[in-house]
């Protein structure tokens, strides 16, 4: 990630970092507008996810998570910024004239060739079924349901590892630390998702955060009792409860929120680490 350094004339330029290597110039046939609904509200207009709202208008880029251009080689033409995710995307020109966006694999550069299918080379950016991959392969964009497209390990810097194959299932270690079973016929992309250092990027000022649609985070202990169970009291008061809670009174900070008796419980060999 190439970082621009500016003359430190203001606090925002002194502390902020800007990636100068990747630009955004999407193709018209691979984008479409979308109704802005990322305000953290449900259908009744009630806040269900805090600290969201505002932000710049976005055009959605159609990403090829299925990689169903089988046995047709494609060339990386551009590496672009995508406002809808923290990973970069790259435009692929296939030999049959098809043009698609895929997630940018770490280390891939303009001019590299990729291909998807069975028995293709184990090369960064290639997509193939898990049954054709050797053990220890680093992968991303992993399918859970055959033919549905990649759903796991799609964020910037995400990488999973193929650690075992037995019967009809393959055992994967996911970025969260979870170890689970997936059908060997499901496909995945070789390599790690690019833009690894995104979590080390310093936005420099509050306005840059608001451009991304993220609002300020306020602690419940400094609110009034009407706004949060932790609020109220004289001066710096404790929360007044045995355990911390959410604004709606449910247990927070450690309470397991996963649905009980979920169908995939039998597929998870080791629960994800906190």
From Swiss-Prot:
PROSITE patterns: RIBOSOMAL_L2. SMART domains: Ribosomal_L2, Ribosomal_L2_C. Gene3D superfamilies: 2.30.30.30, Nucleic acid-binding proteins, Ribosomal protein L2, domain 3. GO terms for molecular function: rRNA binding; structural constituent of ribosome; transferase activity. Residues 1-22, 224-274 are annotated as: Disordered. Its main location: plastid. It is found in: Plastid, Chloroplast. InterPro entries: NA-bd_OB-fold, Rib_uL2_dom2, Ribosomal_uL2, Ribosomal_uL2_bac/org-type, Ribosomal_uL2_C, Ribosomal_uL2_CS, Ribosomal_uL2_dom3, Ribosomal_uL2_RNA-bd_dom. It comes from the Eukaryota. It holds the Pfam family Ribosomal_L2_C. The keyword Plastid applies. GO terms for biological process: translation. Disulfide bonds: none annotated. Keywords: Chloroplast, Plastid, Ribonucleoprotein, Ribosomal protein. The keyword Ribosomal protein applies. GO terms for cellular component: chloroplast; large ribosomal subunit. Belongs to the universal ribosomal protein uL2 family. HAMAP family: Ribosomal_uL2_B. Part of the 50S ribosomal subunit. NCBIfam families: rplB_bact. This is Large ribosomal subunit protein uL2cz/uL2cy. It comes from Helianthus annuus (Common sunflower).
